[in-house]
């Protein structure tokens, strides 16, 4: 039995903007069911936070890092640069029920970078510092 890592998990402002965008989309899609669906998403994020605190490498390798298209390669490089800015060498994705969370991590620290719905291919990444 392995000992829990108890890594620090934090979110950057862009991740919070992604949560707000998800809420706005839910409101647009169906205003009456949006509060319940958003509450479910929040619960999934809290559960993901607990999992990543226990095992930072729980997610799958970020698939878009091997993109072949020009746009995909651009986004992959943007994400790598963002991870380097936070000093976290690994980029991974954690799949929730209908969303995918992109995060950077080391053994003791996890940074939630952004989140997207399961359908779109692209993440809404912030611009890295120059």
Predicted feature descriptions by range:
Residues 1-90, 128-130:
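Basic, Lys/Arg-enriched alpha-helical interface segments
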Residues 2, 82-130:
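Enriched for short, Lys/Arg-rich terminal
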């Amino acid at each position: 039995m392995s000992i829990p890592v108890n890594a620090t998990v934090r979110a950057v402002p862009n991740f919070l903007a992604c949560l707000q965008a998800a809420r706005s989309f839910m409101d647009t899609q169906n205003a009456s069911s949006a509060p319940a669906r958003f509450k479910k998403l929040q619960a999934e994020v809290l559960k993901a936070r607990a999992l990543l605190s226990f095992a930072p490498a729980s997610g799958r390798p970020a698939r878009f890092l091997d993109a072949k298209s020009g746009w995909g390669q651009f986004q992959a490089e943007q994400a790598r640069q963002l991870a380097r800015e936070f000093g976290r060498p690994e980029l991974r994705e954690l799949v929730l029920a209908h969303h995918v969370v992109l995060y950077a991590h080391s053994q003791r620290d996890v940074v939630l970078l952004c989140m997207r719905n399961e359908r779109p291919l692209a993440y809404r990444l912030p611009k890295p510092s120059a």
